[in-house]
Amino acid sequence: MAITAQMVKELREKTGAGMMDCKKALTETNGDMEKAIDWLREKGIAKAAKKADRIAAEGMAYIAVEGNTAVILEVNSETDFVAKNEAFQTLVKELAAHLLKQKPASLDEALGQTMDNGSTVQDYINEAIAKIGEKITLRRFAVVNKADGETFGAYLHMGGRIGVLTLLAGNASEDVAKDVAMHIAALHPKYVSRDDVPQEEIAHEREVLKQQALNEGKPEKIVEKMVEGRLNKFYEDVCLLEQAFVKNPDVTVRQYVESNGATVKQFIRYEVGEGLEKRQDNFAEEVMSQVRKQ
């Protein structure tokens, strides 16, 4: 297939590799983005894919907690102007209150539910769109329940650019649970522990690391040992409990949590716009579009 400049740009953003290397990788893999990432890694050109695709959409993540129930949600807007608008932020908080109270099981169920004001959730969002003049969407949410004795940790970074909700069992204080949430916001782990990593992901990583070592010219008899060592580094990248604790790098998150008599049961991390693309307006046009609405 034809390799476009946009494909090369996307691969560069995902791997940090040079333009010509990205073009060659895409050519060698017939334009398959994931295989091109693996090709670059196997050649030692890229260490790993960046942890998130380009983040471009605007909006806000928010967390609400009441008793033994918590909700984390993401609401998207088209521009940062609207995301910082008081009316938009009020909408997000009212949606959070509804989700916390009604505990819908899916997005479709949530949008069809009736709010305390008599409107359905979807109609309420549509009314906000009409007033604000910009597309607004409830993108995702999760309702989490805890048992007595368990602890929620909630952390919002940069006014809701990133939201993290943690659930700890044991004797953890809210401060400990929040510290873990702050760590997750900064380090972006995918899983709690090694046990949570899917076997197919481990097998894929093992094969990439093996090819990487062979391409470095290492003797085959020591390749397996190298792979196991590098696999440990992979676990440190993706598993929360394996990571050096951001507030005290001398201990792992596991050691920090256990020293406080707790264990991590679950976490949810929302970063606004993950995987979404924003309209290609430039900043001047964005300003003008808002001025015209005044």
Curated annotation (Swiss-Prot):
Pfam families from the UniProt entry: EF-Ts_N, EF_TS
A GO cellular-component term linked to this record: cytoplasm
Q: What is its main location?
A: cytoplasm
The entry's localization annotation reads: Cytoplasm
Look up keyword Protein biosynthesis and say if it applies. yes
CDD domains tied to this protein? UBA_EF-Ts
Q: Show the GO MF annotations.
A: translation elongation factor activity
Keyword terms: Cytoplasm, Elongation factor, Protein biosynthesis
Q: Does the keyword NADP apply?
A: no
Q: Where is this region: Involved in Mg(2+) ion dislocation from EF-Tu?
A: 79-82
In terms of domain of life, where is this protein from? Bacteria
Give the matching SUPFAM superfamilies.
Answer: Elongation factor Ts (EF-Ts), dimerisation domain, UBA-like
What is the annotated role of this protein in its UniProt record?
Associates with the EF-Tu.GDP complex and induces the exchange of GDP to GTP. It remains bound to the aminoacyl-tRNA.EF-Tu.GTP complex up to the GTP hydrolysis stage on the ribosome.
Return the NCBIfam families for the record: tsf
Q: Into which family does the record put it?
A: Belongs to the EF-Ts family.
Q: What is this protein called?
A: Elongation factor Ts
Native source organism of the sequence: Geobacillus kaustophilus (strain HTA426)
Query: Which taxonomic lineage is given here?
Result: Bacteria, Bacillati, Bacillota, Bacilli, Bacillales
